[in-house]
From Swiss-Prot:
Its EC number is 7.4.2.8. One of its GO terms (biological process) is protein import. The gene is secA. It holds the Pfam family SecA_SW. This is Protein translocase subunit SecA. One of its GO terms (molecular function) is protein-exporting ATPase activity.
Amino acid sequence: MASLIEKLLRTGDKKTLRQLRNYADSINALEDSFKTFTDAELREETDRLRERHQDGEKLDNLLPEAFAAVREASSRTLGMRHFDVQLMGGAALHLGNIAEMKTGEGKTLVATAPAYLNALTGKGVHVVTVNDYLAEYQSDLMGRVYRFLGLTSGCILANQDPAVRREQYAADITYGTNNEFGFDYLRDNMAWDRNELVQRGHNFAIVDEVDSILIDEARTPLIISGPAQGDTNRWYSEFAKVVLRLQPEKDYEVDEKKRTVGVLEGGIEKVEDYLGISNLYESANTPLIGFLNNAIKAKELFKRDKDYVIMDGEVLIVDEHTGRILAGRRYNEGMHQAIEAKEGVEIKAENQTLATVTLQNYFRMYGKLSGMTGTAETEAAEFMSTYKLGVVAIPTNRDMQRIDQSDLVFKNETVKFDAVVRDIAERHEKGQPVLVGTTSVEKSEYLSRLLAKDGIRHEVLNAKNHAREAAIVAQAGRKAAVTVATNMAGRGTDIMLGGNAEFTAVAELAKRGLDPEENSEEYESAWPAALEAAKQAVKDEHEEVLNLGGLYVLGTERHESRRIDNQLRGRSGRQGDPGESRFYLSLTDDLMRLFNSGAAERLMNSSVPDDVALESKLVSRAIASAQGQVEGRNAEQRKNVLKYDDVLNRQREAIYSDRRRILEGDDLHEKVQFFVEDTIMALIDDATAGGNGDDWDFHQLWTNLKTLYPVSVSADDIIEEAGGKSRLTVEFLKEELLSDARLVYQAREESIGSESMRELERRVVLSVIGRKWQEHLYEMDYLKEGIGLRAMAQRDPLVEYQREGFTLFQSMMEAIREESVGFLFNLEVEVTPAQDVVVEDAAGGHTEHVEPQVRAAGLEAPEKPAQLQYTAPSEGGGTQTRVETRSTGRSGNPAKAAEQDAAKDAAKRPAKKKRR
């Protein structure tokens, strides 16, 4: 079925490719005339195109000239001219598609033309990469093209100061990772002042390695969390003891493949007896189920010295891909606390979600979205259903010459790796470069030891030091090079036969102390000569490596996803170069062991000698079946994550939209008057629900009203004016009380001034929304945790989540209105009126208007938590958690924060010496 959908999605390919080809022809027709432009004239083209767009001309019409300008600018600044297929890829991106372009087709350069064209709108363009290194590298390199044409480029990196981030977003084109863009969106929606905002909208995004970011990493939502209120730590310790009494298979089941657990009837009874409760599954006990499941997972699925280590009384996560300790990272959803309880170490405070969004819903906010990858075809249906993105396969610049050999399968890992080493040794001896892909750090280090034992010089890369790895991968095509890498290592960098001239030139200029931004003119003048020298240096070696058969890619194991296998293969045979690929497999590989044990067992028990390789169709089918199972499971997980987040997303959009308008200075007076009317009418409706005036409880109604605002009219006055209780109508009661509330509100406004009242409204509503939204996220987490149990009652958990989530949202909105009204009427405030002040400057001084200052308890921006935890997808589809410590306790209020910074700076300055 999937293949049929993919075929249907691709029926428009020929038509789209014709359109893209026509664009390329139009750009080619302009090339000669653009070559005659001086540098200044080429730069002026940007202003001309921008003016035409402002006058109403569509970007589609400007595309040929804009792309021609970028092609010429790139030739002059980088010595790189866009091929026709790169122009076609760029046009596909501009039209909002995914451009499927094979490895080595120059995707980084492809992005420059559509980025430039869409930056002409002045609304900003975001180019999204898989790691900080690539974001910074691409921003520096391609920024030279943009600056040449009079545009600015920026780069968002982890741990940048907010002021720096704001400056980067203000650039015409901004590079960064998906996690950084997403977290900035969440932080902006936790801001208390518009001066804290860093992003300026979501106009157009180009996502590099789009399959990795929008597919592999989409199972894990972005979460910012802080220390939770209340003491839940005792439950972790309690359940760590409980699970020691439970037995696997008898009391609970464990699914190692899906990494899930399920408690059986016998286990439930034991837990209920231990805790002294009658029913674990009644609503009041719902949170306990999460503690129980985590305790079982900690016991069965998380192994000490494999998944984590204990150092200095602390549980530290071990990266499954690299084997390195991930300092400062913690498992989320209470899992880390459950492991701490199991190990008997100090249980650190659990976190509460402060803001969250899935990557799917973050990227769906962009007005236009596009992406590039070498391998999108297998997920074409998902790209269309989730993101409404079509996949366009762009032809290669030259025909592919790589030979993909059939898999070799061995009975066990030992003989497989022996064969791998023999193959590498033969290729190395004749000088052919070899790239070896492994699925884990453990395997790459094991192979490294075998190679060292045979005296084969090699490099080992483990997808952590991106800058070093990119440089090594770029040179992995040199003669006799042997590079062992985990599958994700160095991704996004081309392997060029004979070496990478561009990397060599960049390294040479860096050695001379030149920086593309700090010494831009000197750098630009030195670049052509440096690049030419580097090209000459690799040219001879390139020819030699071509004659040796090009790059040989050797996979030591099949990945869970066919795409990752194809990405590894795609490192070889770039730009029509010769190349070869082969996978060496064993029947004990994780994929076979977990997902197709039947086929593996039959072959294991066959009479074929251990050291003889099999080329079996049965094995190929088993591998395809296993990969299909994993891909199906992962797709289902992504779909499920999205379904639940869609419920929260509608609520998030409403709240964040309100917050943004308040921060940007919207007048809230009308909204507040609606709050007042709605809240008072709700109280009246409750009090007058039954009977007529003789039956209504006026005493209770007035008690409730007085908690809301200082009522200046009595119940007796209104009853008397109506002519008695029996003649009093609900409408008359509402009219009188609303009139009274308006008069009281007007009097309060007159006492503090209209401008100050508007500021008070803004601060109060913002404060209440922030607090209530965090409480609501906690409620939604709590609801989601126990919603799966509804299936036991033959109810659809998603439908129940939608229904109850909507009820919770309505309750929250009602509470926001009621609390805001109460604060606005009753809060004691201290007001500094608005004033005009003279500020000295070079011209002698100018007048600035200072907004009124309103101070009251609860209206200051809350202190940022001492620790914020950032949970996000890791490169490759896992989960990573980073803990950010705010040791200074810097205020979230800009004015207060500035005072703190000034005090801190003053404390650092040495005291002036007194003159004698």
